[in-house]
Amino acid sequence: MTNSKRPVYVITGFLGSGKTTLLNHLVSHVEMKDTAVIINEFGEVGIDHMLVKSSFEDVVLLKNGCLCCTIRGDLLDTLETLAIREEQGEIPSFSRVVIETTGLADPAPILQTLMIDPIITERYVLNSIVTTIDSVNGLAQL
């Protein structure tokens, strides 16, 4: 790993608002080939990871709860494990991380982890938060 901090991008929004579509569009660009993708799923069986076209060597799927609530520690573990596995040569080098939250997530605890946790802030920096909105039903969901 280099000494520079890796940017983290968080994609969030309600169910059906286009998060996975946006992610698919992003990962189709050659400039994004060295990106680690973390897809958060809620419930027993996740489906978003099956909808994301296989563009990366390493997609980490967190499916045992919502990132914002019950597995915030797992986000920390996942980001740390990605860095360690890269350092050990187990996965390809990556220059950025994209986290797609579940449509049920409140992104606040995720952002808190990314901005405050010393283990994370040593290696990563929150770059941006992208919120998708269903243009037809968005107003009704607010």
Question: At which residue positions do the language-model features occur?
Answer:
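A conserved segment at the C-terminal end of the G1
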Residues: 9-12, 17-38, 42
